[in-house]
Amino acid sequence: MDIESEVPVVGKQMLAGNRGKQKTRRSVAKDAIRKPASDSTNGGNWVNVADKIEVHIHFNF
């Protein structure tokens, strides 16, 4: 049985109770947080441009 799971997650993901051979490939793409020039109204806003975590899990039983 071959299960391929592609789950976008934010934060931590815990995997427990996995049996058999397991190949885990994590591709984390996260851009730097850019701060624009200070705005006189609110002192500038922190903008998180991209925060994406891709988890590819392959189970071979």
Swiss-Prot record:
Family label: Belongs to the carmovirus double gene block protein 1 family.
Function, in words: Cell-to-cell movement. Displays RNA-binding activity.
Region (RNA-binding): 17-35
Keyword Iron: no
InterPro entries on file: Tombusvirus_movement (IPR007982)
One of the GO BP terms on file: transport of virus in host, cell to cell
UniProt region (Disordered), positions on chain: 1-45
Pfam families: Tombus_movement (PF05318)
Top-level taxon: Viruses
Self-association state and partner proteins as the record states: Homodimer.
A GO MF term: RNA binding
Alphabetical keyword list: RNA-binding, Transport, Viral movement protein
Protein name as catalogued: Double gene block protein 1
Ranges annotated as biased composition (Basic and acidic residues): 28-37
Keyword Transport: yes
